[in-house]
Amino acid sequence: MTSGRLCLVTGATGYIGGRLVPELLAAGYRVRCASRHPGNLRDHPWAGDVEAVEADVLDAGSLRAALDGVDVAYYLVHAMGGGEDFRERDRRAARTFAGAAREAGASRVVYLGGLYSGGRLSEHLRSRAEVAEILLEAGVPVAVLRAAVIIGSGSVSFEMLRHLTERLPAMVTPRWVRSRIQPIAIRDVLRYLVGAAALPPEVSRGFDIGGPDVLTYRDMMQRYAAVAGLPRRVILPVPVLSPWLSSLWVGLITPVPGGLARPLVGSLTSEVVCREHDIAEYVPDPPGGLLGFDDAVRLALQRVREAGVGTRWSSAPVPGAPSDPLPTDPDWAGGSLYVDEREARTAAPPEAVWRVVEGIGGDNGWYSLPVAWRLRGLLDRLSGGVGLRRGRRDPARLRTGDALDFWRVEAVEPGRLLRLRAEMRLPGRAWLELAVRPGERGGSVYTQRAVFSPHGLLGHLYWRSISPFHALVFGGMPRNIVRAAVAGAGRDRTPTAGPR
């Protein structure tokens, strides 16, 4: 029975917390989110459905207020190696939270920690284990869920794997790529977190949680490459790269900050495999079993593969799948997207600008250097693509699915938005979005975005090599489009002679 029960989620601005909140709401719980900066919660799609309070895990007074009336308290706060004393700060925060939960009369605390299999632990995993021990001694029922690499767009572990695999067709790697790991899909992590709220009160212990696959990091890179449609990677492990040097290497190759990469790399030097699956006694496996690694990667990549990337930069609703990126994820999450964005303001009304936008391409041209577009079309034809020869179906109207030179109309919102998906030969996927919105004093604002999702290292090199030419191809389009709109609006206002 969940109706009316109140859950407190700390760390709601983080990767796990931001995805857990809507799952709790869907399960019928009321949710209160605690943050040092509650205003940062406003950008989440669920912000209007929760209570936001200000609290600091090192401030007992603010925690007691946040925990008032709470049934289940989720502790999802970690110091990711922030300074020499991060372990002490983690211990202090855990003690403060445990004491506040006990005083507030919470019926359960749920903590997501790190999976380990014994032996020598990294500083990162040792700190997680210490936090778990402190919480288990809190005097209230506690569920500690221990997970290794979490597979989902936005997870630091997954983004590190994604960027390394996509950017390096061949690599010399540290020994830890041979460590055995039991990854788990974010969907299954959230299912366990929600299920832990309903554990019987006599259950107070830790549980290992992991997916069905046990793989080395090298295996995960190769399988990611296969799912992403990349060639098999050449991976040569060497014994000379320490975890510290490895984190510098990761920071150089990927956009994941070195301060986040360092503790993660350290934890990968240990074997992280589940020793038990007791959680299934209380939260049974779903029909068909837990999600495997390949399927979890496929879900994480699905948004780009199905051309849903548009929701990342347009006003479309945020997807609800846990594996999807959120608008509050850091910039390095969700895979690489390159964007060329331009804008122009005009006194012409929105309907005049839209007429020009909807009439673009074919015999009407692209409102920039014609030779540049013809050259790009010729290069596409020489490489086996469609080039510019398809033109357009109708000189004035577009509908979803229309061919438009070497583009395909992916979305049309009349008067507001035209999104085109490239069908030219590219090492990746590309979109061109043309949008119109009302401006000041009856005028309008034209926005233009070219977006590229690279496929492997060649895709990154392609974008960087053509970026200098974007000023020629895209630079004049906004100016010329609004000029055409002004001219068209002027013709509309010109009076015509009446009948004589």
Regions found by a protein language model. Give the residues of each.
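N-terminal Rossmann NAD(P)H-binding glycine-rich loop of SDR-like oxidoreductase domains
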Residues: T2-Y29
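Oxidoreductase cofactor-interface core, primarily capturing Rossmann-like NAD(P)-dependent enzymes
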Residues: L20, A27, G119-L230, L248-V256
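Conserved glycine-rich Rossmann-like NAD(P)H-binding loop of the short-chain dehydrogenase/reductase
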Residues: Y29-R36
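NAD(P)H-binding glycine-rich loop region in Rossmannoid oxidoreductase-like domains
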Residues: G39-A104, G114-R120
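Mid/C-terminal beta-alpha module of Rossmann-like enzyme folds, strongest
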Residues: G195-P263, E271-R342
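Glycine-rich portal/gate segments that line the openings of hydrophobic small-molecule binding cavities
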Residues: R345-W354, E358-P427, E440-R441, N480-R483
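Beta-strand/loop substructures that line and gate deep hydrophobic ligand-binding cavities in soluble
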Residues: A422-A471
